[in-house]
């Protein structure tokens, strides 16, 4: 990243742009120090960046930064509510093991299913395009796979 782009990114981050905050923290992590990078990462999460929220939850969960399991759970829940696909899987883990919440297998299953759907929606598109390409309207196996992810 050239100096001009770096300065523009920093100014955007300082003005409150949550996406710029996350991008700036990733830049700092690569080329400067982790402490300042994490400060900007936390700001991005608090400013509503879903990806930063999910990552912040993982930082806490794995002990890379201080925080409680309840805080990690809240980050995962908020990120999943904003549509961050990875957060659904992390939230499922919290429900499965009771990390930061009451253990709930049904909610864990729902989260994993949502995570699976997000992860595999490309597969659904590929299956549909393959059926169109081959002209297979009644292919039971492809229909079963597609239905699993819907």
Regions found by a protein language model. Name each.
Residues 26, 43-46, 50-81, 86:
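Alpha-helical adaptor scaffolds
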Residues 1-8, 30-40, 65-75, 102-111, ...:
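Structural signature of tandem alpha-helical TPR/SEL1-like repeats
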Residues 14-17, 47-50, 62-63, 81-85, ...:
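Short helix-capping/linker turns of helical repeat alpha-solenoids
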Residues 9-12, 28, 44, 79, ...:
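Hydrophobic side-chain positions on well-ordered alpha-helices
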Residues 1, 116-150:
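Terminal, low-structured helical/coil segments at or just beyond the last alpha-helical repeat
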Residues 23-31, 55-62, 90-97, 128-132:
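Hydrophobic face of amphipathic alpha-helices that form TPR/SEL1-like repeat modules
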């Amino acid at each position: 990243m050239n100096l001009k782009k770096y300065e523009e990114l920093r100014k955007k981050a300082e003005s409150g742009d949550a996406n710029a905050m996350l991008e700036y923290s990733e830049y700092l992590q690569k080329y400067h120090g982790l402490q300042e990078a994490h400060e900007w990462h936390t700001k991005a999460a608090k400013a509503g960046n879903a990806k930063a929220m999910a990552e912040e939850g993982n930082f806490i969960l794995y002990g890379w930064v201080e925080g409680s399991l309840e805080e990690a759970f809240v980050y995962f829940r908020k990120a999943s509510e904003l549509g961050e696909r990875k957060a659904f899987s992390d939230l499922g883990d919290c429900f499965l093991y009771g990390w930061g919440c009451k253990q709930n297998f049904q909610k864990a299953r729902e989260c994993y299913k949502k995570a699976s759907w997000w992860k595999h929606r490309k597969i659904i598109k590929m299956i549909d395009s393959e059926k169109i390409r081959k002209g297979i309207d009644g292919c039971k196996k492809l229909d079963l796979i597609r239905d699993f992810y819907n």
